[in-house]
Amino acid sequence: MLISGRSGWAILGTGGKAAVNRGDAGKLGGQSVIARAHVKVDGDVVSRFATCCRALGLAVYDRQRPADLAAARSGFTALARIAHDQCDVWIGLAAAGDVSTPVLAAISCTADTAGMLQRQVELAPAALGFHYDTGLYLQFRAIGPDDFHLAYAASLASTGGPGPYAEADQIVTGIIDRRPGWRDARWVAAVIHYRAGRWSDVVKLLTPIVNDPDIDEAYTHAAKIALGTALARLGMFAPALSYLEEPAGPVAVAAVDGALAKALVLRAHTDEESASEVLQDLYAAHPDNEQIEQALSDTSFGIVTTTAARIDARTDPWDPETEPGVEDFIDPAAHERKAVLLHEAERQLAEFIGLDEVKNQVSRLKSSVAMELVRKQRGLMVAQRAHHLVFAGPPGTGKTTIARVVAKVYCGLGLLKKENIREVHRADLIGQHIGETEAKTNAVIDSALDGVLFLDEAYALVATGAKNDFGLVAIDTLLARMENDRDRLVVIIAGYRADLDKFLDTNEGLRSRFTRNIDFPSYASHELVEIAHKMAEQRDSVFEQAALDELEVLFANLATSSTPDSNGISRRSLDIAGNGRFVRNIVERSEEEREFRLDHSNNVGTGELSDEELMTVTSEDVRRSVEPLLRGLGLMVPHD
């Protein structure tokens, strides 16, 4: 598809028709076609054929009457059931208006009998024929065998898909081999490649046509717009614009497509003012066109480009989905690394203790981004979604770790080029003098491009509440870069919910960009015990049961008590301690107490310490580690 949204590039005759196998072509009512060049035709068939041709308004035996297409279509449909091996019957049915893929397949398969019935009823040469849709802007008239094969190929391609494209191309290639200068065959070949997104082939096929002085104005107009579009899809904007500069012409739908393509090429050239003028004129003339409306309202709506080399690298030449992305093509191992990143992200998420709702939200986020990218690749409408996130919750609940998981997911899906996450705080962004904050913020953002910027305690940027706080400058700078680098930057802000809400209210642009929230609840006491057990296990340590019981009581007490934070706000004591972060500190400090205890035991230096003694953390080790930790946090130390 041409653009990142639902394809509105008008292509005629793209209704949902079923592809027909060559072996099934010509079947109607379960009867198979047997094509024969010299067959004595039944007199009743000739008579009925003559009647049907008169209904088409053709001169039969030099006699003619007004056309009745409904009667002609009904008559030819009935006649095809008994004379299914006669191409002229199928041609008549197409002339009466049935140019469906099965009918065109039958015409193609019985082409060597074409003319037999026409001669019997003395039709003028080329009197019996039909118009068919090429699938892009133009209609051709079919009167001979090569026309019939071409019509079937065009109809087959209109059904879409790698199989039909390949079969249609095989038919047309055979015709071009016999008649290399036939423009109609080259046009249908170009349409097949256009539909399959083989833009470099479209350019090769149409360049001779668009420069041919002998073709009519409509043909030239259609070829010019299609060629300009193909060049734009290849990222060759300057030559594309040379064909799209004056998109008006006799083919109305091509004129609209050309004008929209021109606007998007101008946008790609960063000439948004000119692009907007073209789009406004288009919208005034076509207010119901969804693509024009979206392109006008969304400046990120643009052309998705590729290269001839990437097209040639498809594993299936007719399937755009097998085309490697930019990173995959430059680095063939990139696809494998993306799969590894997604696997790592899923593994890390599964290993998290608790946080069931957080895990669910991250899984939904992954699905949302994955399907958004698939829809974009298919040319379907994709609503503009910001991928920035709000992680709301107390310290130590896994926000930073989950941010790393999200970075892996985004990179693994191809939304970001890197899995890097740059964690920053107020001090990293704020300067002391005018102009310094903007420079520092831009430098930090530059270092985070193509990855994730994780702004912890984001509300600290405006904590003073002063109007001249440099934090407001940092926010304005961040918002501008989030817009200008929207395809290269994902920002995650983290902190307490109430504080984040106040932060988002400080600038009207913040809430519109941070629309997705993931809430991180405080851990339950039993979850923290499980975390401690697992953390110790990973360090070749083990808590004795009495130590685990000691921890459970400690965590329960902290979870049910409250303590003022540094700003005087009453918070759960466990949140002040830092939840999972507090657990890590306990594990590390308890191991230090164990080492000190063993070092001063009677067994040290005698070689009699067992592995169990070297690994076991006792309740006394825990008690001795907890007291200084709690004092350092300003929390009450429990007493027996």
From Swiss-Prot:
**Got a GO cellular component term for this one?**
cytoplasm
The record's annotation in SMART domains points to: AAA (SM00382)
Source taxon at top rank: Bacteria
GO molecular-function term, one example from the UniProt record: ATP hydrolysis activity
Q: What is its main location?
A: cytoplasm
Amino-acid positions noted as binding ATP in the UniProt annotation, renumbered to this chain: G393, P394, P395, G396, T397, G398, K399, T400
Location(s), subcellular:
Cytoplasm
Q: Which UniProt keywords apply?
A: ATP-binding, Cytoplasm, Nucleotide-binding
Q: Which InterPro entries match?
A: AAA+_ATPase, AAA_lid_6, ATPase_AAA_core, CbxX/CfxQ, CbxX/CfxQ_RuBisCO_ESX, P-loop_NTPase, T7SS_EccA, T7SS_EccA1-like_N
UniProt similarity note: Belongs to the CbxX/CfxQ family.
On subunit structure and binding partners, the annotation says: Part of the ESX-3 / type VII secretion system (T7SS), which is composed of cytosolic and membrane components.
Q: What does this protein do?
A: Part of an ESX-3 / type VII specialized secretion system (T7SS), which exports several proteins. EccA3 exhibits ATPase activity and may provide energy for the export of ESX-3 substrates.
Protein name in UniProt: ESX-3 secretion system protein EccA3
Query: What is the primary gene name for this protein?
Result: eccA3
